[in-house]
Amino acid sequence: MTEEVSRKQNFRQLGLSKWLVESLDAMRIRTPTAIQSGCIPEILKGRDCIGGAKTGSGKTIAFAGPMLTQWSEDPTGMFGIVLTPTRELAMQIAEQFTALGSYMNIRVALVVGGESIVDQALQLQRKPHFIIATPGRLAHHILNSGDDTVGGLKRVKYLVLDEADILLTETFSNDLKTCVGALPPKEKRQTLLFTATITDQVRALQDAPVQKGKQPLFCYEVENVDNVAIPSTLNTEYVLVPEHVKEAYLYQLLTCESYANSTAIIFVNRTTAAEVLRRTLKALDVRVASLHSQMPQQERTNSMHRFRANAARVLIATDVASRGLDIPTVELVINYDIPSDPDTFIHRSGRTARAGRKGDAISFITQRDVSRIEAIEARINMKMTECDKVHDTAVIRKALTKVSKAKREALMAMEKENFGERRKLQKRKTQKDGKRV
C-alpha cells in the first residue's frame, strides 16, 4: 500500500551518520525526498524493503544512505552488492557511492560487461566494500574466477536490486540465480528492491513467508506509482508523421526555434535505426552521440561523457538509456519509435522533467502506431496534444531534400562497412560472454 511520511525531517533525524549527512550537504542534498524519508528509517531497523517511486525521486540515496551508515560502523570486507540491468546505470550508481563515501575512503568495484575481466577480478580480490554490477558479468566471475575473487560475497550484509521489475524478468533469471546463490541466505542479509514500476511480480514478494528471526518485509510506494505515472511538469505531445520521411520531420523539430539549442534524447526501438540516425544527423551538422547495446563499452562511455558535457546536444538511444539515468539538463525526449509497452514510454519520458524541472516528450506517430498510443494514453491517464512546431510545408521546403541525401549516404556507408554483420558478431560475442547489455 501507499504510505505517507512527513518530509520535514532532515537526514540526521532519519538516522544517517553525521559524516554522511555532511557529505550530502557538500553535494547540496539537504532535504529528503518522500522515498528517502519513507525507506531509510525502516532499512536502518534491519527490514527488507520494496521501494517504489517515480523516476528522478532519489531512490539511490534511499538505499545507499542506510548501507553506508551501517558500513561505517565496521568498515571492513565486502558489505553490499547492488545489481542493476544496464552498464550505464551501474556506472552512475558506482559514481554516487564513491561520491557519498569520499569522506571515508570507501572502496567501490564496478563489475559490468565490456570491461577487462582480469582487472575486475583483481578489484574483487582486494575485497571492495561495495560491488555495483550487472548480473551477467558478476555471474561470470562467480562461475569462473575462483574463491579468492568472489569468496567475500558469502559475507555481504546487503543485496540491492535496482530496477527490480526488470531484473526479475526471464531475461536475467539464470544470472540472478547465480549471483544470489553466492550470497548468504536471505535470513542472514537484508534485501532491498527499488523500482519506478512495482509490477505484480514484485508486489507478490510481500506475500512470501517471513524468515525466522527477521522482521516483516516493508513496502513503500510514493504517490501510488501505478496511477501517477508521469511528472506534472512533463508536457506530452505528438506529431503525425509519414513513415518514409520521419528523418526529415526529426531534423526539422531539432532545428526549429523552440528546440535549436535544447538537449534531447531520441529513443528508437532498434540499434540499426540508432546508427542510421546518428550518421544522418551528424552529416547535417547536429552535435550527436548514440547509445545502444551493440556498441563497444568504451564508445558507450564516451557517448555518455560527451552528452553530459554538452559536447553532444542530442543522444540517440535504444531503451538501454530509458532506465534510471540521471542527466538533469535534458529538456526534450523524442519517441522516434513508439514502444510496445506503455511503461517503457513512461521510463523514456522520465529522462526529462526531473526533480521539478519542466520538460517535453514528443512522440512521432505513424499510421501503425495508433493502438500503441491509445494504450499509452490509457496508462498515463491523459491525452497527448498535437505539436504545432513542425508543419508539412516547412518540412518539404526546408528539410526533405538534404535529409534524404544524408540518409542515403549513411545507409551506403553502413553497407560498405558491413554494419549488420559486425552487429551480428558483437551479439554472438555478447551472448557467449554472458553479458546482457
Swiss-Prot record:
The keyword Nucleus applies. GO terms for biological process: endonucleolytic cleavage in 5'-ETS of tricistronic rRNA transcript (SSU-rRNA, 5.8S rRNA, LSU-rRNA); endonucleolytic cleavage in ITS1 to separate SSU-rRNA from 5.8S rRNA and LSU-rRNA from tricistronic rRNA transcript (SSU-rRNA, 5.8S rRNA, LSU-rRNA); endonucleolytic cleavage to generate mature 5'-end of SSU-rRNA from (SSU-rRNA, 5.8S rRNA, LSU-rRNA). Residues 40-216 form the Helicase ATP-binding domain. CDD domains: DEADc_DDX49, SF2_C_DEAD. Its EC number is 3.6.4.13. Its main location: nucleus. A motif (Q motif) lies at residues 9-37. One of its GO terms (molecular function) is ATP binding. InterPro entries: DEAD/DEAH_box_helicase_dom, DEAD_box_RNA_helicase, Helicase_ATP-bd, Helicase_C-like, P-loop_NTPase, RNA_helicase_DEAD_Q_motif. ATP-binding RNA helicase involved in 40S ribosomal subunit biogenesis and is required for the normal formation of 18S rRNAs through pre-rRNA processing at A0, A1 and A2 sites. Required for vegetative growth. This is ATP-dependent RNA helicase DBP8. It comes from Candida glabrata (strain ATCC 2001 / BCRC 20586 / JCM 3761 / NBRC 0622 / NRRL Y-65 / CBS 138).
